[in-house]
Amino acid sequence: MALQAQQQATPSPTRDRAGSGEWLADTEKLPGAAASPEDVVVASTHHAAAAARYVPPRATSHTAEPNPGRGGGGGWYSWNGGRRARHDPPAPRRQQPAKTPPPAPPLPAAPPPPPAASPAPAPRAPPPHAQVRSADRVVPAILSRKRRAAVMQRAALLARAAAAGLCLAALAVLASDTRRGWARDSYSNYAQFRYSEAVNVVGFLYSVFQFVALAELMRRNKHLIPHPKRDLFDFTMDQVVAYLLISSSSSATARASDLIENWGSDSFPSMANGSIAISFVAFVVFAICSLISAYNLFRRDM
């Protein structure tokens, strides 16, 4: 730093009594060329000697706005300072709204109580003429049902008697067919004829049993077998015997035809054919008995 001293006829400098360290009227500033904050020249006009002293720069200061609210410069600064940035006060913090729990769902409304059950109305008594009409309808229905049951029993009795007679005739004809023809042949030598003879015996015995049971039922109103099992037994046995008759007659017919083709026609195969024809008729009668027993089994008033 360069310091310059200059003697002038000015009063000697004096210090402020308040102790602020500033020079009073005995100091003067130099022109604008030496007015920088870095180089300051102080001239002393003391008559004894010129003294040079370094004066530190002042801190930057800011004055209040002279005319607030009217616009303008917004205040002035000292010569040796720059404009300081204005620090705006921090914005107030935004308060977060308090989190409130969601409202509880409303409770479901209680269902209304069920209405009281009203007593059922008393049944109306039918008029007297309706009772008379219902009685007139029931009695004929019962009588017709009894007549129908009696007719079915008579038909079943006749069918049993016919089946027993036919089976007896068939087995008698075939049993007499021994030592017949030019070969003196017998039915016992052929399995088909023996099978037909056995089935005719079974059919005859079963038909006799059914005939006796039906006669006892019609006379005393009592059957040898209880009612629920009786109809099922009759239906099953009629089906079985009818199947045996048709199968034995078919096999015996095939055997008799074979004998006629091989050895010619004579009395032996002719009697066998007669017995087979009677067995076929017995099968038809057993089929009718099966229909009657099925009606008795599946009728409504069982």
From Swiss-Prot:
Q: What is the protein's major site of localization?
A: membrane
Membrane side Extracellular: residue ranges? 176-197, 257-273
Q: Which residues lie on this side of the membrane: Cytoplasmic?
A: 1-154, 219-238, 295-302
InterPro entries, A to Z: CASP_dom
Q: Which Pfam families match?
A: CASP_dom
Keyword Membrane found = yes
Which residue windows are transmembrane per the record?
155-175, 198-218, 239-256, 274-294
This protein's assembly is summarised as:
Homodimer and heterodimers.
Q: What is this protein called?
A: CASP-like protein 4A2
